[in-house]
């Protein structure tokens, strides 16, 4: 049977043996095949695989994980970073710094996931470079960079992202929004909403906001209702239909109808009715 099927399957004897062999033998080819399946596996399956890999990592084989870094996957970056940190601590920090400085974008993204687990003082000198990689067009590298900067409370990056909101270039404004959302800058919401109301990218901006503020909180204000109106309007042309599930929209609509009906929410509900009746 195909090893990927065994690793993702339900037979403990099979998936435990494959996971152990994967790490013990540093099977780069098998890991590369696993990463290529990312778009075809359900999230719960990938979570199962990550947990299976996690259970077989130990003090004797954790360094083998370094051989997997050319094949990036957001599904497995945490388990790899945690394995390296849990068994290598800061002793392997020099190796990860070298990978971050000189590696390809995939390796840099993994290194940053590791950096997100260690105290600021150990990577202080790398912060200027991390601010640069936060602007990378390789999204995992950007996201993982901003995660580190957020955990380090890096006010320089946050300030630069806020400045982008004042740009006359709407692409720059939108990038600023994405950076602030990834940074978890909740206090920037008023500025983000102000940009959204004026921007021709209002629907794109709206789609980012639920990753900063829960939809259940957004419905408590008229500005939040406007965010949801923009999101509904953008489905499916700009925002994929899966957003209905991601944002738990039907439950939100039901709550509005039963408990929080207002003139603003009535507009949203009417818009949703017309959109999803199509």
Regions found by a protein language model. Name each.
Residues 1, 24-27:
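Short alpha-helical hairpin
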Residues 1-19:
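N-terminal "cap/leader" segments of large eukaryotic alpha-helical scaffolds
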Residues 1-2, 61-65, 157:
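Repeat-mediated protein-protein interaction surfaces in helical alpha-solenoids
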Residues 9, 26-28, 40:
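N-terminal "mature head" segments of proteins
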Residues 13-25, 36, 43-58, 67, ...:
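Structural detector for internal amphipathic alpha-helices that build alpha-solenoid repeat scaffolds
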Residues 28-31, 62, 92-93, 123-127, ...:
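Core helices of alpha-solenoid repeat scaffolds
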Residues 75, 126-127, 171, 198:
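HEAT/HEAT-like alpha-solenoid repeats
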């Amino acid at each position: 049977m195909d090893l990927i099927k065994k690793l993702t399957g339900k037979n403990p004897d099979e998936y435990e043996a494959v996971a152990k062999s994967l790490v013990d033998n540093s099977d780069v080819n098998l890991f590369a095949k696993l990463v290529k399946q990312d778009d075809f596996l359900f999230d719960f399956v990938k979570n199962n695989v990550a947990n299976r890999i996690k259970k077989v990592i130990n003090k004797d084989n954790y360094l083998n994980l370094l051989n997997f870094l050319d094949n990036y996957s957001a599904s497995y970056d945490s388990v790899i970073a945690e394995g390296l940190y849990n068994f290598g601590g800061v002793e392997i920090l020099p190796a990860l710094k070298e990978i971050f400085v000189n590696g390809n974008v995939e390796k840099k993204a993994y290194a940053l996931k590791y950096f997100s687990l260690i105290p600021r003082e150990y990577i202080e000198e790398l912060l200027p470079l991390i601010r640069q990689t936060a602007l990378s067009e390789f999204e995992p590298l950007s996201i993982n960079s901003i995660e580190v900067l957020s955990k380090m409370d890096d006010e320089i990056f946050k300030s630069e992202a806020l400045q982008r909101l004042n740009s006359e270039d709407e692409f720059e404004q939108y990038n600023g929004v994405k950076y602030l959302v990834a940074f978890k800058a909740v206090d920037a919401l008023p500025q983000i909403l102000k940009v959204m109301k004026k921007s021709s990218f209002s629907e794109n901006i709206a789609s980012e906001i639920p990753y900063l503020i829960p939809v259940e909180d957004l419905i408590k204000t008229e500005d939040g209702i406007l965010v949801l109106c923009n999101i509904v309007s953008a489905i499916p042309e700009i925002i994929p239909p899966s957003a209905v599930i991601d944002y738990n929209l039907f439950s939100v609509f039901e709550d509005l109808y039963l408990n929080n009906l207002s003139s603003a929410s009535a507009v949203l509900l009417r818009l949703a009715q017309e959109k999803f009746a199509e």
